[in-house]
């Protein structure tokens, strides 16, 4: 009996919710009666849908596509009144019954399979740490009459002199003052706990939760690592849980990289390692306990860092986070335990846990694409023995200009990142993991956003130039 059928029978499930992720990382769903999943061929034939309605996918002349549910992903939805079973789906091309070339989950699957063909390893593990803000209310608009946004947060540092219903209690983190405070300074302990309870209920293993550095409600929930595709699935589930619990509490959550000017943004540090025959290939006798394989993996990420930014930092807003002075790693260098480097080697108690941590990605990234791209960059480093050079065991934020200019940096804008992705794509197309067709479509899709933001009249321009 399949996992789905067992859950349907055990919990009297009424509905199944088929979910998939588009190119930008947005989740979509369609809901159908649970009885359909009891049919013998459901997991072979799937459900038809209109692919032309998904940005960056099909044209209207060839729009039919298939949602093929993955039985291993079956989990009960804790937020629905009627018992509902969530199933993550792969996108299938009806003409070939193969995975759709532009499906991000299919790309992540191909990256895992490509790893096996290289002989370097058979399993890749990913452990992302997506940060997020929880606000009380947000208002924004952008049209021909003007543009604005306004954040309402009782715990914002700017609220100390404001009238608040029930009284202003005064306990709130200041700018860059929110790391690890206890309640009542940590206003979000209970809501994070509710999020963690929901994640555990959905099969994820929570390791830690805490308030993060920024004021106004920056938070993090740490969940146990997993294999690449499964971890990307779990990131999407975590986002779903965070948004829905916040909504249930009458609040609103965001994973945008830099919602506040003048305070830390939200990153998504990604821990990675490769195993072969059950052994961690990153453990060795070199720098910080790393193997030569791990150092070459780091070398690949550093070499392709700017091209990677197109997937790991895919928003114009990403580059408002990637600036010096806000704990964002802009230098493409590596170091043990040095959080100013873009690649860190965390301290571990056992060689089994040896890994690298890429610190420049952010949670606007599509996790399937970001994890797959990081893996492909690392594999290229291993295959071509790209050594990363000496470790940067110093505070890179304080380097004098003449030293800083010798260290490569991440991109400074989405436009630059897309240009670097375009010209540096060769490492991604190995083994057919990313296709040129997909990369072209992705660049076109993200370029539309970049052009819109770049050409839109900004409120700050009125402040700077209205009286010229």
Curated annotation (Swiss-Prot):
Q: Which SUPFAM superfamilies does the protein's record reference? A: Glutamine synthetase, N-terminal domain, Glutamine synthetase/guanido kinase
Report the EC code(s) recorded for this entry.
Answer: 6.3.1.2
Annotated GS catalytic domain residues: 104-468
- Gene Ontology CC, one term: cytoplasm
Q: Does the record carry Nucleotide-binding as a key word?
A: yes
Q: Which UniProt keywords apply?
A: ATP-binding, Ligase, Magnesium, Manganese, Metal-binding, Nucleotide-binding, Phosphoprotein
How does activity shift as pH rises or falls?
Answer: Optimum pH is 8.0 (in the presence 30 mM Mg(2+)) and 7.5 (in the presence of 3 mM Mn(2+)).
Q: What Pfam families does the record point to? A: Gln-synt_C, Gln-synt_N
The answer, when asked if Transmembrane helix is one of the entry's keywords, is: no
- Which parts of the sequence belong to the GS beta-grasp domain? 11-96
Describe the reaction catalysed, as an equation: L-glutamate + NH4(+) + ATP = L-glutamine + ADP + phosphate + H(+)
Q: Where is the signal peptide?
A: none
Cite the binding residues for Mg(2+) 1. 129, 269, 357
InterPro entries in alphabetical order: Gln_synt_N (IPR008147), Gln_synt_N_sf (IPR036651), Gln_synth/guanido_kin_cat_dom (IPR014746), Gln_synth_cat_dom (IPR008146), Gln_synth_gly_rich_site (IPR027303), Gln_synth_I (IPR004809), Gln_synth_I_adenylation_site (IPR001637), Gln_synth_N_conserv_site (IPR027302)
Any inhibitors or activators noted? When cellular nitrogen levels are high, the C-terminal adenylyl transferase (AT) of GlnE inhibits GlnA by covalent transfer of an adenylyl group from ATP to Tyr-397. Conversely, when nitrogen levels are low, the N-terminal adenylyl removase (AR) of GlnE activates GlnA by removing the adenylyl group by phosphorolysis. The fully adenylated enzyme complex is inactive.
Which positions does UniProt annotate for L-glutamate binding? 264-265, 321, 327, 339, 359
Q: Which residues carry this modification: O-AMP-tyrosine?
A: 397
Residues bound to ATP are: 207, 271-273, 339, 344, 352
Per its Swiss-Prot or TrEMBL entry, what cofactor is needed?
A: Mg(2+); Mn(2+)
**Cofactor: binding details:** Binds 2 Mg(2+) or Mn(2+) ions per subunit, however the activity with Mg(2+) is about 10-fold higher than with Mn(2+).
> What's its job?
Catalyzes the formation of glutamine from glutamate and ammonia. In vitro, can also use hydroxylamine, methylamine and ethylamine, with 32%, 7% and 1% activity compared to ammonia, respectively.
Question: Quaternary state and partners of this protein?
Answer: Oligomer of 12 subunits arranged in the form of two hexagons.
The protein, known as: Glutamine synthetase
């Amino acid at each position: 009996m399949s996992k789905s059928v067992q859950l349907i029978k055990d919990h009297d499930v009424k509905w199944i919710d088929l979910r998939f992720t588009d190119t930008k990382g947005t989740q979509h769903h369609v809901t159908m009666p649970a009885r359909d999943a009891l049919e013998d061929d459901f997991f072979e034939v799937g459900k038809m849908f209109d692919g032309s309605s998904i940005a960056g996918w099909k044209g209207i002349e060839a729009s039919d596509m298939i949602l093929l549910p993955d039985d291993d992903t079956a989990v009960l939805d804790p937020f629905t009144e009627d018992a509902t079973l969530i199933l993550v789906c792969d996108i299938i091309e009806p003409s070939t019954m193969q995975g759709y070339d532009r499906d991000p989950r299919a790309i992540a699957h191909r990256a895992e399979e490509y790893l096996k063909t290289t002989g370097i390893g058979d399993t890749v593990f990913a452990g992302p740490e997506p940060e997020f803000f929880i606000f009380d209310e947000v208002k924004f608009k952008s049209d021909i009459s003007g543009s604005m946004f306004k954040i309402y947060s009782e715990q914002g540092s700017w609220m100390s002199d404001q009238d608040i219903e029930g009284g202003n209690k005064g306990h709130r983190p200041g700018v860059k003052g929110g790391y690890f405070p206890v309640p009542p300074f940590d206003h979000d302990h209970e809501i994070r706990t509710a999020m963690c309870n929901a994640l555990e209920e959905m099969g994820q293993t929570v390791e830690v939760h805490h308030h993060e550095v920024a004021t106004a409600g920056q938070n993090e929930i740490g969940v146990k690592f997993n294999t690449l595709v499964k971890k990307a699935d779990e990131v999407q589930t975590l986002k779903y849980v965070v948004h829905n619990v916040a909504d249930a509490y009458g609040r609103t959550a965001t994973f945008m990289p830099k919602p506040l000017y003048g305070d830390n943004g939200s990153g998504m540090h990604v821990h990675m390692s490769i195993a072969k025959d059950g052994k961690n290939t990153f453990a060795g006798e070199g720098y910080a306990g790393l193997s030569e394989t791990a150092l070459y993996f780091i070398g690949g990420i550093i070499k392709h860092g700017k091209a990677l930014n197109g997937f790991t930092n895919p928003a114009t807003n990403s580059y408002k986070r990637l600036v010096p002075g806000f704990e964002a790693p802009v230098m493409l260098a590596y170091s043990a335990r040095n959080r100013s480097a873009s690649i860190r080697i965390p301290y571990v108690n056992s060689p089994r846990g040896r890994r690298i941590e890429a610190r420049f990605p952010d949670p606007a990234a599509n996790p399937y694409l970001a994890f797959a791209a990081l893996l492909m960059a690392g594999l290229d480093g291993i295959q071509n023995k790209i050594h990363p050079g000496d470790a940067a065991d110093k505070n890179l934020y304080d380097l004098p200009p003449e030293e800083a200019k010798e260290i490569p940096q991440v991109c400074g804008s989405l436009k630059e990142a897309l240009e670097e992705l375009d010209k540096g794509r060769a490492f991604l197309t190995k083994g057919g993991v990313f296709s040129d067709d997909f990369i072209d479509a992705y660049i076109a899709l993200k370029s539309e956003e970049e052009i819109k933001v770049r050409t839109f009249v900004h409120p700050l321009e009125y402040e700077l130039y209205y009286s010229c």
